[in-house]
Amino acid sequence: MKRFPKILPALILALVLFPSLGGSVEGTPANEEFRYRWQLRNFMGAVAGLFFPRQGEGSLTFMRSNGHLKSELTITSPQSKEEGYFRYGSEIDVRTLQPIRAWSAYSWRGESKSKNEAVSKDGVLDVAAGIYAIRSDPPKKSRRMQIWSDGKIYPVVVIPVGTEIRQLPHGKVTARHYSIRGVNIPNERRWKGKLDLWLATDEAATPVEILISRNMADVRMELMSRP
């Protein structure tokens, strides 16, 4: 059963290793913080919940300083008797979208681990900064991108699905749905995760819902306040 404690970190890591969609991110607000509730779902999510937290709260933040954008995702769970957490983020150059650093850290049931390293691959960002870029320049048709995961590069496609009504904790919200999937390219690795993103139709394109799927388990994050 040792592999089950790795499922949630892998799912959340999938969330933060998402590419930029190109262009500048100048159009969105300078500093933002979004609060979410999250829950493990699906068959493997239920099984993993026997060994790992099944629900909790999270935050997605975007902070600018000296021409850099710091994006970070943090999740916590009240199921932890200690102050358990998972944290992933990156720092990029706002003007060029060039990645500078990426980091990850977690602490759970007495086990902790952290990593902080420079990122030299052009055009590849963590998912939080990627979401920031999608909000600034929403794709109108399928767009090929790459994701960076622990030094490995994976090709993906970003697919605009359409406008949907989503039921969230504060009520119904009209949102634009985007799906991110791995693609098969000869001699390149295939990303096995799935990511779905719903952006409100407000001026800020608020990220109201995020769904990460991996290893038959789902993590669903829902915005706790009305956009």
Locate each region found by the language model.
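Bacterial N-terminal signal peptides that target proteins for export
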Residues: M1-A10
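Bacterial N-terminal signal peptides
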Residues: P9-S20
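Acidic, serine/threonine-rich low-complexity disordered tracts
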Residues: G23-A118, P138-P227
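Low-complexity, intrinsically disordered short segments enriched for Gly/Pro and polybasic residues
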Residues: D126, G130-Y132, P138, R143
